[in-house]
Amino acid sequence: MAKNIQAIRGMNDYLPGETAIWQRIEGTLKNVLGSYGYSEIRLPIVEQTPLFKRAIGEVTDVVEKEMYTFEDLNGDSLTLRPEGTAGCVRAGIEHGLLYNQEQRLWYIGPMFRHERPQKGRYRQFHQLGCEVFGLQGPDIDAELIMLTARWWRALGISEHVTLELNSIGSLEARANYRDALVAFLEQHKEKLDEDCKRRMYTNPLRVLDSKNPEVQALLNDAPALGDYLDEESREHFAGLCKLLESAGIAYTVNQRLVRGLDYYNRTVFEWVTNSLGSQGTVCAGGRYDGLVEQLGGRATPAVGFAMGLERLVLLVQAVNPEFKADPIVDIYLVASGADTQSAAMALAERLRDELQGVKLMTNHGGGNFKKQFARADKWGARVAVVLGESEVTNGTAVVKDLRSGEQTAVAQDSVAAHLRTLLG
């Protein structure tokens, strides 16, 4: 017997029972995006490798250790996208969407990183990202955060996420802070773990992200990034905080929040939760005013974020049990008798025409009434429409409310109207 081929470790199948809840959550997210005037952009999952090296940074963990990179048949180095911002910027430059224009874009789809798989962290994972181009004030930063807060309210998880904010300033301010931080770390090198020693010279701000308790204790005495901010970044951050306070959005300033990708400047933020164990970041982003120019476009202010959908689904399921998947089927059409199947299928097509958006399944494979009603129950139907030989002859159908058990004989021409009343 041939050996079964299984999914690659860290790349998961999502089965019908799971995709139903994903679809409802995604529908909620998309409705909110539409209410803010954001437009979808669809991007390739494979890009040229230099795009990510230039955008993310050569000495980041993502580029050094996590990218799925391969050579194609033409000898070109290609990479499965590890994040969405770089590809969105590339598309904006390539298609002339950015220069002297405002764009509010969103995308959704799989990303790929070669990490150690664990709950909430996978090698193929899904993100929804938003990117805004052409606006440089703190007001658009605030709008993005307000948009995410509206998502949490719609999903019933507001009480389980908290907002952390920071400003990492301009490139020049960050360079000055980098020098001060390296000088401090060199004085305490013996207290650093091997990972932090490596990062100290390649990407020292990432030491602030260390999960090592001893390093965290050491960092209490480290120089504060806020003390090195340029005046323009201070004013920008103060403006953002004031707007969030006016909107009633609570936040905590976390001066160790730096983000893991090199392209960020000024505003950075994360929505975090205590309900998912170690994988606490649900949504994160910030401003990246230099990235468009860095990738070959003209200087364009930009800000955005990405949200991990696997973690969001886990969080919704953990803290909001009332958030259920929509039923697969609203109506199940039961047909019994030698000559009823063609009539049942014709009625089903007519009902689909008249009841837009209603999910109707016709019984196939025969079976007595008991078996067919069991199938209706399995698919979550609220109503059964029953056709037997006598109903076909009389031009009627029996409509049965599967919750109350009440049933009514209705002329076939009136079935759609009766169903509208039952389904609300």
From Swiss-Prot:
Keyword Nucleotide-binding appears in the UniProt entry: yes
Subunit structure: Homodimer.
GO biological process, one term: histidyl-tRNA aminoacylation
The entry's keywords: Aminoacyl-tRNA synthetase, ATP-binding, Cytoplasm, Ligase, Nucleotide-binding, Protein biosynthesis
GO molecular function: ATP binding; histidine-tRNA ligase activity
Annotated protein name in UniProt: Histidine--tRNA ligase
Listed PROSITE patterns: AA_TRNA_LIGASE_II (PS50862)
Catalytic activity: tRNA(His) + L-histidine + ATP = L-histidyl-tRNA(His) + AMP + diphosphate + H(+)
EC number: 6.1.1.21
Record keyword Ligase present: yes
Annotated Gene Ontology cellular component terms: cytoplasm
PANTHER family linked to this entry: HISTIDINE--TRNA LIGASE, MITOCHONDRIAL-RELATED (PTHR43707:SF1), HISTIDYL-TRNA SYNTHETASE (PTHR43707)
Transmembrane segments: none
Lineage: superkingdom: Bacteria
Compartments where found: Cytoplasm
Recorded family membership: Belongs to the class-II aminoacyl-tRNA synthetase family.
